[in-house]
Amino acid sequence: NDLPMHLAVGHWILENGQVPNVDPFSATGHGGPWVAHEWLAATLFKSVESLGHPNFLIALAVLLSASLGGLLELIQRSFGVPAFWRLLLLVPVWLAVGRRLMLRPHLLALNLVLLVWWITRHGRPSPRWLWVLIPVMTLWANLHGSFLLGIAYIIGDLCIFSQGHTLPRKQRFMIAGGSVLATLVNPHGVALYLFPFQLALDPVFTAGVFEWLPPWTAPGFMTTPAAISGIGLFSLALLGSALQGWGSENSGLRGLLKRPGFALSLLAAVTATFLASRQLRHLALASLLWAPLIGVLWGTLNWRISPSLQKAALAFPVALVLLLGFQGYPAGIDAQGQWRWRSIGSGWSPQTPVIPIDTLVNQWEVSGVLLCEYEFGGFTSYISGGKLRPTMDSRNTVYTPEFFLAHEAALRGENEELRKTLTEKASAILVHPGKPGRRSL
């Protein structure tokens, strides 16, 4: 339900030639202040779709997913991770990351996380590369709210954990300061800095949306390949650290922490793991950050690996390709205890409300207010081109938590006053008949 909202926002921006600072879509939040923090991603998505076929969006998702793999390979090589460990980690890393490889702004943000990481590493022997961080941070601030992570990492790498940098201290501080100032180049100014906290600390949405739940409380998540692989990666990190031991001046963890960039990278991976323990949506980030570090932890143990075993490691990427080719990787276990496979297809899923909304707008020529589920709001704004204005959508910063709960209560029939108000305003009603109280509408 997020991609259609981004496409609607991108369409509005391209049509009006500006970034909205008030909500132009909702019937109940219409005209209220709104920080369109992912406006550039929305414009990109809509521009790609406008090339002529929705499958161009799928191609963009494939391209961004592939670039993640390319950047991760560059980072692992910069750490000196042996090919054996790079191959061995392919399957668990990409099974853990796979469920987040969807076309949403966070896919761009994951690429930028790895890009900043690689630039800070490559910038040690080639300091001119560090100046690229400034335009990268301008781009990041307009694509996704996670740009604050980039600011923190750049300051940490250039100003605190600066071992191995050949650029003079003054210039490093200039780049760090320039990277911070670069994020102010956005349509919302300093308001953009508050938005990520408003989004992440909303108690209503974080408790009601699957990806914002802790892994162990999200229904069925702990049996998915993503969760199993994530646990496996974290276990490898812990075991590798234990086998390393604290060590001496030049060995063990003590020696690794003195390597350029390793200490900050380890701190970033631990932080991402903590975030993933709070909200499962961060599992992909944690897995990507741990992959090179696990390779370092195990690759520096100086264990002798026979050539035949090294060749056997090639079986892992081959197995991954075969697994992905067989109708997609397993998405979970069904009620009968069988693996549920993802099916291959294109276009919008029939489980989405595309057909009923298209019928309302293009066949029945309905316009005005649409009383609907929050997950239908983005589709409504996108498909109707603004002709229908939903009473609720997934942009939690447009609505207060109190109104979101009241809207849900009205749909269930537990808030008669608001239900009456909304139905009187509505030109049409689109609800999920399987949810409580909907059939009475």
Language model features: what each stretch is:
Residues 14, 19, 145-258, 287:
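Transmembrane catalytic cores of multi-pass membrane glycosyltransferases
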Residues 59-79:
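Transmembrane-helix motifs of polytopic, lipid-linked glycan transferases
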Residues 71, 93-96, 108-125, 154-158, ...:
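Specific aromatic-rich, kink-prone transmembrane helix
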Residues 92-97, 129-145, 153-154, 178-183, ...:
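Membrane-interface alpha helices of multi-pass inner-membrane proteins
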Residues 122-138, 169-175, 259-269:
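Short hydrophobic alpha-helices at membrane interfaces in multi-pass membrane enzymes
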Residues 310-364, 375-377, 384, 395-396, ...:
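Membrane-proximal, lumen/periplasm-facing interface regions of secretory-pathway glyco-
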Residues 359-402, 427-434:
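Short periplasmic/luminal acceptor-recognition loop of GT-C membrane glycosyltransferases, typified by
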Residues 383, 402-441:
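Periplasmic/luminal catalytic loop of GT-C fold multi-pass membrane glycosyltransferases
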